[in-house]
């Protein structure tokens, strides 16, 4: 890391460009870096505003509105050796938690007679796509009662207005 004679202010963060490994490597402040073609200035922002700006930049995916009770197909990226493929996982959304960049959905399906639930971080790079197959009509925020039900009792009524 090269030493700069000018000390950065208390709200500037030094970022070294690691792509150039020479001694005269360029030192940038975070206020000068660009994110997705936009220059972000953090000199007058509070730490909470800096975090919010970063999280908003990470939420770039175009994802459909997913509600509890919907049947969804989640494309999960799986890397096997040096290959990468997308494996679909289809089931009913039984819970939604958190919001923003930390949003998760719990998807339940029956596989070979056994109930399987997976929790997906919606904005994770491992989630390639989310497609809503059919909308569900439910009157609860969490559908954990479906765990005790078997067979046709686990069906959710279809909703046509969304």
From Swiss-Prot:
Keywords: Ribonucleoprotein, Ribosomal protein. Gene3D superfamilies: 2.30.30.790. PROSITE patterns: RIBOSOMAL_L19. GO terms for molecular function: structural constituent of ribosome. Residues 1-17, 25-35 have a biased composition (Basic and acidic residues). The keyword Magnesium does not apply. One of its GO terms (biological process) is translation. Residues 1-40 are annotated as: Disordered. Pfam families: Ribosomal_L19. Transmembrane segments: none annotated. The keyword Ribosomal protein applies. GO terms for cellular component: cytosolic large ribosomal subunit. This protein is located at the 30S-50S ribosomal subunit interface and may play a role in the structure and function of the aminoacyl-tRNA binding site. Belongs to the bacterial ribosomal protein bL19 family. This is Large ribosomal subunit protein bL19. It comes from Prochlorococcus marinus (strain NATL2A). The gene is rplS.
């Amino acid at each position: 890391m090269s030493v700069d004679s000018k000390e950065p202010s208390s709200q500037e963060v030094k970022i070294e460009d690691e792509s150039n490994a020479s001694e005269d490597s360029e030192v940038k402040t975070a206020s000068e870096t660009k994110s997705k073609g936009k220059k972000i200035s953090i000199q007058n922002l509070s730490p909470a505003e800096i975090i919010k700006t970063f999280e908003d930049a990470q939420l770039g995916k175009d994802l459909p509105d997913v509600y509890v009770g919907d049947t969804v197909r989640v494309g999960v990226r799986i890397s096997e050796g040096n290959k990468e493929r997308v494996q679909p996982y289809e089931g009913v959304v039984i819970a939604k938690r958190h919001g923003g960049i930390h949003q998760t959905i719990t998807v339940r399906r029956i596989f070979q007679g056994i109930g399987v639930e997976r929790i997906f971080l919606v904005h994770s790079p491992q989630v390639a796509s989310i497609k809503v197959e059919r909308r569900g009509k439910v009157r609860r925020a969490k559908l954990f009662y479906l765990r005790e039900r078997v067979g046709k009792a686990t069906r959710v009524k279809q909703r046509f207005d969304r």
